[in-house]
């Protein structure tokens, strides 16, 4: 499903499970900055409160780079808020509202979360 399926959860706290597929720096020159959201984490096979979604991107500070690299290719579970954001539609250059997540809980493996 697409991220528009997250619309009913707008501004609400949800449980997110997914597999960390890729971790990278948004800007490699800012890798020593502590406050910028510079780490991009790609989650695949995501389930947000029972709704299946293909993929989601998490934007985190640099301290999460090492943690996410340890958890790469593992299923993780955490709580998050669904937040709306605007992006540019490449076909006609209009702003389109889409939905993403902002992490509120810690990134832990799904097995550790259940225990």
What is the role of each PLM region?
Residues 1-7:
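Transition segments tied to proteolytic processing and entry into folded domains
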Residues 8-47:
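Structural detector for short beta-strands of small beta-barrel domains
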Residues 11, 60-79:
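Short nucleic-acid-contacting surface segments enriched for D/E, G, S/T with interspersed K/R
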Residues 14, 18, 56-63:
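Generic detection of short hydrophobic beta-strand segments and adjacent strand-loop junctions
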Residues 16-20, 76-83:
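OB-fold and OB-like beta-barrel modules that bind single-stranded nucleic acids
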Residues 44-46, 81-115:
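OB-fold/S1-family single-stranded nucleic acid-binding modules
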Residues 47-57:
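Short, basic/aromatic beta-hairpin or loop at an interaction surface
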Residues 51-53, 73-75, 112-115:
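Polybasic, proline/glycine-rich intrinsically disordered low-complexity segments
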């Amino acid at each position: 499903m697409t991220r528009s399926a997250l619309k009913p959860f707008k501004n609400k706290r949800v449980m997110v499970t997914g597999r960390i597929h890729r971790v990278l720096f948004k800007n490699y020159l800012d890798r020593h900055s502590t406050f910028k959201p510079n780490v991009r984490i790609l989650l695949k096979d995501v389930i947000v409160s029972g709704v299946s979604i293909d993929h989601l991107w998490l934007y985190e500070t640099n301290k999460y780079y090492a943690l996410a690299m340890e958890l790469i290719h593992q299923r993780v579970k955490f709580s998050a808020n669904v937040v709306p954001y605007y992006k540019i539609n490449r076909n006609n250059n209009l702003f389109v509202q889409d939905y993403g997540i902002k992490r509120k809980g810690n990134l832990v493996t799904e097995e550790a979360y259940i225990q």
